[in-house]
């Protein structure tokens, strides 16, 4: 596969979450019409694959299940011809503003992620959490390869938890491997509950079942 742009956005889903994809795409087209979107197929239905036939679709054929395929999808996309930077977006992320400038914030050998303040407050036994709903990479970081391998070897709860456990509560290691991004690029549902949400976020992340209900109301 040969993509026309060096900076690409990437999302992905299977049959369980593909219902979010048309909603996600509509918002993406509204605020990022000139940007290239690649879609990772984690096991979508034939109907959905037909619906998105105008997009570049990458089948992720690996043993991981569901969201555990995310690091693998990022890894495979980063290796495509001409691609220099990749930004992963979960399908429950609502694009609410211009997002192309996020690529200006990438750092080599690091995962660009927003600090998950609600999770850090609620479950901080291993220090700061970083939310994996939006992940920015430049090139193919070694930490991404390790994360993808760990999601296959030790799939614990979710891909974000796997990365958190890999860091082992070592804040120095997090500084080495994680590039903190501004909260406007991943404002969480719980940020609103905790009254810490930024004004006019560019990406609103509707996490969990309550987030799903919010998305359904917008369909």
Language-model regions: role of each:
Residues 1-66, 79-82, 208-211:
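N-terminal anchoring/stem segment of glycosyltransferases
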Residues 19-22, 68, 72, 157-165:
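A structural signal for well-ordered alpha-helical segments within the folded catalytic domains
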Residues 34-43, 87, 112-113, 181, ...:
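Short, hydrophobic beta-strand segments that form beta-sheet elements in well-ordered domains
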Residues 40-47, 97-99, 117, 184-186, ...:
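Short, polar loop motifs at secondary-structure junctions
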Residues 46-53, 102-106, 198, 216-217:
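Short loop/helix-cap segments at secondary-structure boundaries that form the rim of catalytic
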Residues 57-59, 65-123, 136-137:
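GT-A fold catalytic core of metal-dependent nucleotide-sugar glycosyltransferases
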Residues 126, 131-135:
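Glycine/small-residue-rich pyrophosphate-binding loop that anchors the diphosphate of NDP-sugar donors
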Residues 134-218:
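Catalytic core and acceptor-binding pocket of nucleotide-sugar-dependent glycosyltransferases
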């Amino acid at each position: 596969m040969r993509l026309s742009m060096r900076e690409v956005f990437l999302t992905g889903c299977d049959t369980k979450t593909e219902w979010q994809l048309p909603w996600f795409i509509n918002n993406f087209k509204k605020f990022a019409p000139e940007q290239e979107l690649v879609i990772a197929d984690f096991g979508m239905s034939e109907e959905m694959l037909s619906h998105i036939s105008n997009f570049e679709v990458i089948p992720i054929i690996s043993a991981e299940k569901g969201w555990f395929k995310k690091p693998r999808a990022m890894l495979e996309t980063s290796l495509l011809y001409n691609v220099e930077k990749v930004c992963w977006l979960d399908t429950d992320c609502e694009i609410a503003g211009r997002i192309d400038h996020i690529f200006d914030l990438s750092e080599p050998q690091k995962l660009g992620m927003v600090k998950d303040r609600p999770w850090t407050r609620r479950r901080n036994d291993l220090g700061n959490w970083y939310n994996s709903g939006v992940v920015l990479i430049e090139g193919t970081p070694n930490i991404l390869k390790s994360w993808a391998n760990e999601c296959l070897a030790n799939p614990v709860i979710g891909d974000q938890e796997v990365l958190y456990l890999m860091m082992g509560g070592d804040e120095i290691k997090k500084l080495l491997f994680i590039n903190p991004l501004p909260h406007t690029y991943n404002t969480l549902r719980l940020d609103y509950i905790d009254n810490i949400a930024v004004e006019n976020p560019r990406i609103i992340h509707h996490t969990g079942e309550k987030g799903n209900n919010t998305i359904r109301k917008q369909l």
